[in-house]
Amino acid sequence: MEEKRMNEAESLELITSMINDSRARMTKNLGTPFLIWGYTTVAVSICQAVIVACVEEFYPYLWGWFAIPVVGWLLMLLFNKQEKTVTNYIDRCINALWCAIGVAAFILPFMGVFVFPSVIMLIGVGTATTAAVVKDKIVKRIGYAAIFSSLLFPFVRLLLSRLFTLEQFAGRERYLVECIIFAVIMFLLLVVSGRILNYKKRCLKS
């Protein structure tokens, strides 16, 4: 009976140690992926806004959004080569979560859904979940705030439909406004979160 209790205690201690080890390692390396995807997304969003403002036929340039996964994955490959670490079950679960979110975000444009708020909700869920694992309350709140901020898009569309006629605020102008809102939210969600995580990493080192 005592041996069984010891085995249970050892198992619990092993699980706790694994979680703490994952938390420490993830906190060490977590900020940079947020910055990579954040800056890439914001840069592409700004480019899209500029193209919409300057080009008459902007629809062919919508394929430019796929620069986000291409550039993001290339930069992540470079980052992972430099930061070779041993992973455990917790790490693999978080990686699987973000891979699933990435695949879902990639498929969304082909499904005819409202892409901007849907992507923000997905990234917000991933951010809040990851922050919960590493016990970062600020980043967790940012993730939840981003999820709720996705409601801005239908609200803005409703507001603009009341203030302007369809001719005054056609697809081009509405898309331009939504690109800007998307860029701002993604900057706050990913770039600010990445900066916070990197700042805490530097504090732990010192």
What is the predicted function of each stretch?
Residues 126-206:
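Terminal transmembrane helical module of multi-pass membrane proteins
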Residues 30-41, 65-69, 116-119, 123, ...:
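Hydrophobic alpha-helical transmembrane segments of polytopic
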Residues 53-62, 108-118, 165-178:
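Membrane-helix interface and helix-disruption motif detector
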Residues 88-151:
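Membrane-proximal helix-loop-helix units in multi-pass membrane proteins
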Residues 42-46, 50, 71-74, 110, ...:
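Membrane-embedded alpha-helical segments of small multi-pass membrane proteins
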Residues 1-30:
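N-terminal juxtamembrane cytosolic/stromal segments of multi-pass membrane proteins
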Residues 25-107:
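Selected alpha-helical membrane-embedding segments in polytopic membrane proteins
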